[in-house]
Amino acid sequence: MTAQIIIAVPKGRILKEVLPLFAALGIVPEPAFGDEDSRLLRFATNRSDIGLIRVRAFDVATFVAHGAAQLGIVGSDVLMEFDYSELYAPVDLAIGHCRISVAEPVAMAAGDDPREWSHVRVATKYPNITRRHFEARGVQAECVKLNGAMEIAPVLGLSSRIVDLVSTGRTLKDNGLAEVETIAEVSSRLIVNRAAFKTRAGEIGPLVEGFRRAVEDKNAA
């Protein structure tokens, strides 16, 4: 019996944008998949050859890179941070739009010019992206790795600035921070394990093309 194709999907709000793409491919997950409060990690679909797992965004790339899942949906921020050679990202799904930005306290931003920075201490869950960004400008970046609650770091003196994902900017504003620089625009991508794409091309190839057509049809609508 041929093993299932496993598609890894990140937890959170992106689920609502993923479901229409699955529907366009004729993939219908079990009801619990759309429930953000469900503690299940693995889900069945209407197709016996396709299963889903729902994990943290950073873990999607790891599961696919190591072959535990054959396909995944993940933000381009994760691909920029980890740069796995085992991953192929053939389709920009045009969902999950946001940006990676530098932010600092509003009072500091009022008289600050990023072009004059020579050294920064930054709290972030993206140390690799942050270092590369500042190194390219000749700025020394000291990164404090956090997995969440970045916005409170400047308040408590852990760092003077943060680098984080920004969507509406509401969370920054609520915590007295101002966005001062955009590092990169972010959207969700379909990723594929390179080895699986070669060995199971007959199964994976049509799925990749299905996602591509779904995005094209959505953009044309």
Swiss-Prot record:
Which Gene Ontology cellular component terms are annotated? cytoplasm
In which pathway does this enzyme or protein participate?
Answer: Amino-acid biosynthesis; L-histidine biosynthesis; L-histidine from 5-phospho-alpha-D-ribose 1-diphosphate: step 1/9
* Broad class of where this protein is predominantly found: cytoplasm
* Entry keyword set: Amino-acid biosynthesis, ATP-binding, Cytoplasm, Glycosyltransferase, Histidine biosynthesis, Nucleotide-binding, Transferase
According to its UniProt record, the EC number is: 2.4.2.17
Molecular functions per Gene Ontology: ATP binding; ATP phosphoribosyltransferase activity
Enumerate the subcellular locations listed in this protein's record, separating them with semicolons: Cytoplasm
Q: Which reaction does it catalyse?
A: 1-(5-phospho-beta-D-ribosyl)-ATP + diphosphate = 5-phospho-alpha-D-ribose 1-diphosphate + ATP
Extract one GO BP annotation from the record: L-histidine biosynthetic process
Q: So which domain of life are we looking at?
A: Bacteria
The record ties this protein, via SUPFAM superfamilies, to: Periplasmic binding protein-like II
Family stated for the protein in its record: Belongs to the ATP phosphoribosyltransferase family. Short subfamily.
Provide the function of this protein.
Catalyzes the condensation of ATP and 5-phosphoribose 1-diphosphate to form N'-(5'-phosphoribosyl)-ATP (PR-ATP). Has a crucial role in the pathway because the rate of histidine biosynthesis seems to be controlled primarily by regulation of HisG enzymatic activity.
The record describes its quaternary structure and partners as: Heteromultimer composed of HisG and HisZ subunits.
Q: What is known of its domains?
A: Lacks the C-terminal regulatory region which is replaced by HisZ.
Q: What is this protein called?
A: ATP phosphoribosyltransferase
Which species?
Rhizorhabdus wittichii (strain DSM 6014 / CCUG 31198 / JCM 15750 / NBRC 105917 / EY 4224 / RW1)
Q: What is the lineage of its organism?
A: Bacteria, Pseudomonadati, Pseudomonadota, Alphaproteobacteria, Sphingomonadales
